[in-house]
Amino acid sequence: MRARNKRMEYMKELDFPFDAEYVLRKKKSLKRALLEREGVKYLNKKIAILGGSTTENIKLMLELFLLNNGIAPEFYESEYNRYWEDAVFGTPELDEFKPDLIYIHTTVRNLKIRPDVTMSSSQIDEILDAEYKRFEAMWEKIEERYGCIVIQNNFEQPYYRLLGNSDISDIHGLSNFLSRLNLKFAEYAQTHEKFHLNDIHYISAEYGIKNWSDPADWYRYKYNPCVAATPDLAYNLARIIKALYGKNKKAIACDLDNTLWGGVVGDDGPENIKIGREDAVSELYEEFQGYIRAHRDLGILLTVASKNDEENALAGLARPDGVLKKDDFLVIKANWENKNTNIANTAAEINIGADAFVFVDDNPMERNIVESTIDGIAVPDLGDPETYIRIMDGAGYFEVTGLSADDLKRNEMYKANISRATAAASFTDYTEYLKSLEMKAEILPFSPMYMARITELTNKSNQFNLTTRRCTQAETESFAADPNYITLYGKLIDKFGDNGVVSVVFGHVNDEDSTPDCKIFDIDLWLMSCRVLKRDMECAMMDELVRLAKEKGVDKIRGFYYPTAKNKMVKEFYADRGYTKVSEDEEGNTVWELETEGYENRNSVIAVN
């Protein structure tokens, strides 16, 4: 086993690009080492695998990659080829299991009907529709019965082409049939937020169709794909799952010299660095800059951490034939400080964890320093410039499972925060500064319009999150519909821009602990995006929560704080809001109470609704 940095959250053996043969061979010792890591608080999730082939190895590989991302899976595994029956008719075991997520592992081997050359065009359309509806019925039954996330494989290309090259264009070809069926699957995914595709059409092509589907493995053991390909499939699947549960990275810290351009700008001069279309090396760096720039449009925060004079760094970014410009970066740290220090300072400035970064640098020594000093940061071994994009893309640090309006304008939101910080520096009275922001909040019960964003926040927010409870969209929808619950989302707008939905609170009347003389309301979850810290948004949310609780006849509100490695900043949140601590256990979990009678509103700087 290769040496590991004991401080790191991630095990290098399971980072992309991994040695699949090694992972298969050492799966037991790798799992043991993952579970022995100190300080990792796992997110527990129940995952049902409904398979059209033997799935034992897929389950074992998926477990490793999920553990490496801080997710501890508990599995239900269907009997061989019982995926459809389990999904449509259910089983007592699956019902009792109550999955958070169902993964349906089907492949070309599981098609019930295939086209042949004797069929007419209309007959082929009919069997295509029948095959699609067979799957659609399964997805709808899962939604009806479990209301959970579904991940479904699309289809790989067949390992032979009966019609040769015409197999893809002729309606009788299986390749053509599968392409049309895959498109139907994709269209379903576009209109169902809890449904996601595991793109084995792409993964199998990347792996190599001839090697992906081994007839010997299929006929002897009913493996599809072959055993050797299961780590690749499981890694791709784990990318989706970790993204769904808030484990994506949020920012890129880029080196400059020999990373975003060829050469050293301080030595060669900005006019001589390699970028643009003049030669092959320049084109390589231009494409990589374009790849990094595209992440900005996805809401990924771009920053610079470079050992350089700032003047030289900015001159390099000013090259007219470069893709990335100064304004594409939220923060530029071009100086002679250590890069780990610069990344930590950048993280503090924009108010995210340093472990939310991917550090991109061509220099192995710089990578090692950053990796060994910042827990949880991702540091890919980029290789040569020709492989930069392949390594970054294959790792799936920023796997997209849905794009919200907030995602698309995230960079603008963080830039506005920097403008706010600049404005704050000109005030001596902080309350006057807050008033100058002209803040307006929309604080209302959960709305279908924002349900996806609310769910996303419950699975991503870690620092300002008092209980770190994670929720599926089905759960958030059920809370909104339950008259025993109070649910609130908060949007915040000020003169610098719209912050979007930034806070979520929900809880329920605790009938069990209530008495005829004292109705108790428990806050199940309270979270807020760190980009609106110290803006009194929490006060506005508290005021509205207490108002609604009083309408329900609540006499006492109870709040809970469960400490994690990341939420220490809110340890005294309830104390600062006038709550009284009533208990604390040996793990630091605390319970707080507030009498609603006599509560006075705390927000004085935000106009609400």
Range-by-range predicted roles:
Residues 442, 446-529:
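A conserved beta-strand-loop-helix scaffold within acyl/acetyltransferase catalytic domains
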Residues 287-318, 332, 370, 466-471, ...:
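Substrate-recognition element of Asp-dependent hydrolases with the DxDx(T/V) motif
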Residues 249-265:
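Asp-based phosphoryl-transfer active-site loop
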Residues 502-585:
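Acyl-donor binding region in acyl/amide transferases
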